């Protein structure tokens, strides 16, 4: 709009200037001619030339005036429109000063129960377990002048308690020749005699110490846990770690049961409760021997007192089981000697567990037995039969679901419990 007004003003000025120049030149011409209009040819020619020059100048001014709006329009078209002024962005709210992330406070490790306290508590627990084995024997043997039928009842009671055929026959023979039993029965004498005979059968003088606790034990002392899935093997491994922690030993565990998805997690949970590190694979189905090898290398590097290695308990293929356990032992012994192989047996399975026990004994060779769930079994005679069949002692027993319900096997406490 301003450009158009400028063009109009310029045109008016040019026209006014042209008129003024025309009048001025006319005055000059009149002055030169003495204001007398000469009537000769020369004067007429000069006037015509002046008029022509004035007309030409007027045409030039008109042409310039007409060209000016077009030029203005072109420049207006060429000139970019002024950019709209961007509204300033609102200032960002000041960020709060970053505070360092608070680390979760690690749970305080539990303090396991001492071994002495366990033994006292577990003896009482066994006495209250209601095992009918000892009571049934005592009720028969407390009779006066036992008949042949009574002796058959004694043998049947022993067999039902899973003492085993050979051990049952041996005990009956010993009792038959004891004057305290065959004559007029004194209940106190009968009880004392029965306790003595059962202790002999269980093995009162058998060395039941774990090899890791013996003088001159290797350090780290390696314990391999074997057993059928479902016997409480992994749980027993965790409880055994607590037992060693209670004795102020530095413990490490290896999760070589890589075929049961929850086994490594379960072992880690047990380890975390007493601050025991667990070596495991991040991949399900990994080679168990590689886990055992890594665990033994790390235990050696850390100079741990004890390394407990949990293994798989699949019995679907005896050949594969033997190969797997044999390989675990061989690769572990490249780093550390294996001091102990503990077989975990469920006491409630009775004689059915004996076939399983023999498979593991053949596969890897065992040095001791852990009887789990002994409190839930009326078949306490498994202690006798497993020792007689395998030729190795029962070293540990489990009497409950509590984390400290695992203790060294005490023959006298066991016999007292079943005769209570």
Swiss-Prot record:
Residues 63-104 have a biased composition (Low complexity). Its EC number is 3.6.5.4. One of its GO terms (biological process) is SRP-dependent cotranslational protein targeting to membrane. Part of the signal recognition particle protein translocation system, which is composed of SRP and FtsY. GTP binds at residues 227-234, 310-314, 372-375. SMART domains: AAA, SRP54, SRP54_N. This is Signal recognition particle receptor FtsY. The keyword Cytoplasm applies. PROSITE patterns: SRP54. Involved in targeting and insertion of nascent membrane proteins into the cytoplasmic membrane. Acts as a receptor for the complex formed by the signal recognition particle (SRP) and the ribosome-nascent chain (RNC). Residues 28-118 are annotated as: Disordered. InterPro entries: AAA+_ATPase, P-loop_NTPase, Signal_recog_particl_SRP54_hlx, SR_rcpt_FtsY, SRP/SRP_N, SRP54_GTPase_dom, SRP54_N_sf. It is found in: Cell membrane; Cytoplasm. Keywords: Cell membrane, Cytoplasm, GTP-binding, Hydrolase, Membrane, Nucleotide-binding, Receptor. The gene is ftsY. One of its GO terms (molecular function) is GTP binding. It catalyses: GTP + H2O = GDP + phosphate + H(+). It holds the Pfam family SRP54.
